[in-house]
């Protein structure tokens, strides 16, 4: 079995055809490895923009891709053709789903369908790595994962597609376990895969929603582990509910914060606690930026 870890860079631009903003892919970077995670080949292609004429200042600063590089790039359709050959029958991996969604968006623009017929097997590498290093309330970025795993990133160009794919590989190597990886395989030839990718995560903000359970609203005391009692009503703020709690066993008081996200798989409950004199840390707000 072979794996291809893909990273993309794209530029947010306005599309007249779509009458809206569009994430135009400007660079492909990928690394192919065998079942021992030894590198077999790498892939790097810059795409000449055909929708937006200028890169946003944010993309310029992040990627350092020059106008000269873009001018020498290939068309998007040519880039995809090259990547198809590179991918072959390998299992595709990306860090999170944003790259897959960008591929689907660009495929829809150029071919009229968002189905990626050249992808058979898929693994969300971010989800796989989070099973070990999981911080409650937020997704793990690639740089954070590398830092937690003690990976030396010197000499790598962050936010360049090939280097980011190699960094993702380094994380994968540290955590690889053949048996533990199996549950993360997805069949990208099935309708269910695209239904899942298209599903928009939403924040549930009605406590009477039948999808929510009473047990989800309980908190354990962070000091002694006993079930705490809520003091007062729930307050909804910054996309989450919060309330004061007191432990009947040790008398400890703390603030509890809870967020409900409706994902394709169902409701995901995320909780944080903090001492009463503190505000709960802003993990959940940060998660909103890239959660899917």
Give names to the regions the model predicted.
Residues 3-4, 43, 219, 245:
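A broad, low-specificity signal marking well-ordered, structured residues that form hydrophobic/aromatic
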Residues 10-12, 49, 129, 232-234:
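Short, well-ordered turn and helix-capping elements at secondary-structure junctions
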Residues 19, 69-72, 135:
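Alpha-helix initiation/capping motif
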Residues 174-292:
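Acidic two-metal-ion nuclease catalytic site recognized across multiple nuclease folds
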Residues 61-79:
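Metal-dependent phosphoesterase signature
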Residues 21-26, 32-63, 84-204:
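Metal-dependent phosphoesterase core characteristic of DEDDh/y 3'-5' exonuclease domains
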Residues 1-27, 31-36:
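Entry/capping segment at the start of metal-dependent catalytic domains
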């Amino acid at each position: 079995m072979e794996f291809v870890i893909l990273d993309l860079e794209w530029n947010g631009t306005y599309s007249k055809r779509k009458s809206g903003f569009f994430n135009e892919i400007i660079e492909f970077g990928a690394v192919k490895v065998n079942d021992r995670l030894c590198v077999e080949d790498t892939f790097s292609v810059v795409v000449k923009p055909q929708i937006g004429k200028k890169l946003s200042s944010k993309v310029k600063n992040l990627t350092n891709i020059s106008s000269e590089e873009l001018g020498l790039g290939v068309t998007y359709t040519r880039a995809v053709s090259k990547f198809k050959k590179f991918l072959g029958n390998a299992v595709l991996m990306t860090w999170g789903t944003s790259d897959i969604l960008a591929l689907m968006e660009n495929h829809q623009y150029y071919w009229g369908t968002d189905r990626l017929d050249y992808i058979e097997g898929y693994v969300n590498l971010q989800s796989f790595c989070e099973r070990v290093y999981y911080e409650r309330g937020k997704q793990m970025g690639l740089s954070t994962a590398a830092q937690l795993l003690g990976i030396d990133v010197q000499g790598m160009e962050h936010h360049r597609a090939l280097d980011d794919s190699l960094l993702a590989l380094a994380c994968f190597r540290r955590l690889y376990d053949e048996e533990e990886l199996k549950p993360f395989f997805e069949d990208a030839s099935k309708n269910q895969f695209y239904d899942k990718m298209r599903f928009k995560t939403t924040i549930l903000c009605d406590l009477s929603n039948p999808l929510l359970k009473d047990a989800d609203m309980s908190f354990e005391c962070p000091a002694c582990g006993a079930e705490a009692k809520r003091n007062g009503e729930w307050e909804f703020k910054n996309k989450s509910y919060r309330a004061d709690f007191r432990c009947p066993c040790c008398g400890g008081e703390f603030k509890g914060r809870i967020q409900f996200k409706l994902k394709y798989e169902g409701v995901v409950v995320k909780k944080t606690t903090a001492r009463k004199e503190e505000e709960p840390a802003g993990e959940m707000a940060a998660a909103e930026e890239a959660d899917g």
